[in-house]
């Protein structure tokens, strides 16, 4: 647990390494880590949303981040070597902020005691809050078993009390929504529930949140997209255009991010019934996350859309940290997800930049692939996400092939006390083999790989029987490498310093040869610029 304890200590007072706002207005957001409030207490928020409301005490607008606190989030943060198969609702927690990075300690605004007074606990999740000026009420919409629960408060700071539950059967044909979030139009202040069909999630809907018969309800329902099953349903607005966004139905695991867009919130959305894969999410499945919610920052210099991904690590075991926040870029009207480990945001101007400690390797902990690869079921694949495998000698990688080597390994509980998550890179075969696994890292329009010196690291363990295990990085015609020449049946670190990157391109990888039956695991690969 030493590695995880050190990481937690570094991130005690925010979403990044700084304990207080920086003088230039840029504050760091570090993904792949557990987050902490300004007093050092954990942030357990999952499946929620950020909204801009007036502080009841000062009248000043602030950011209000609501999310569900599950008991398992506490347990997993304390010991990420155990994945949980049940979720137990503790509360909806509220954190507030003025810069989207430094957040106040959690305040439970909807408690399990309040829920228990009106029914069984069961599933509660996927929630958001809307302000209804006609009633001077804040309405919290949350999935509750087979219904949509509505709780209300006269203050954005709660407490929220049970108001009623909505059976969606006469509206969409199922009593529940598939997934849902609350979206508030930044130009009109009107809020909407963005959600999917309760069975199969193959239809997406928009409903305005308003008052009906004296209480908050869902009005003006419209089906705006159908076809493939999609969950994590949410929305953002950019340059007057609405983007309906969703993830694949992979349970708790990360997935590709999909979208359609329209000039009106009720559509028509294009391409019609054909959600497109968002650029930038393909090589690590949206930074090993699902679509959670978005927030558009109207800065003084630029408008930045914040992708707030849910990593359900407590239930998927797919890494560290429950929230993965990253900025979007746009090529015209086409959104691009910038998958970053560490970056800095200026909330006032809307500007952002890559942080000096960013890890440029994508899917470096090999958690994007939720099952064994090669995989014969959805998503059918014969390679690791973000990585290329070259078979130099040995059995070829074949889906459903009886002799095909497996490319990833299911980490044991003992493994997970040292390395990240349920999966690692795996080298083994039934016959003598030689294999190379590589990833090419290249500058993009928004995320440059600056020329200069870098350090490459990884964790490795292996059985006897290997001719060589080489970790390497290549750039500008130069090769930098390190070899393992002794047996390491326990995890050990690999490190290459002084990797010189030229022309904004680098290839990192591993070259391994071994006897039949020899096994090697590699995990937590990084390429970070030297400071």
Predicted regions, residues:
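Carbohydrate-active catalytic/glycan-binding domains of CAZyme proteins
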Residues: 20-374, 416-419, 490-493, 531
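Extracellular and organelle-lumenal recognition/adhesion modules and their flexible linkers in secreted
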Residues: 353-531
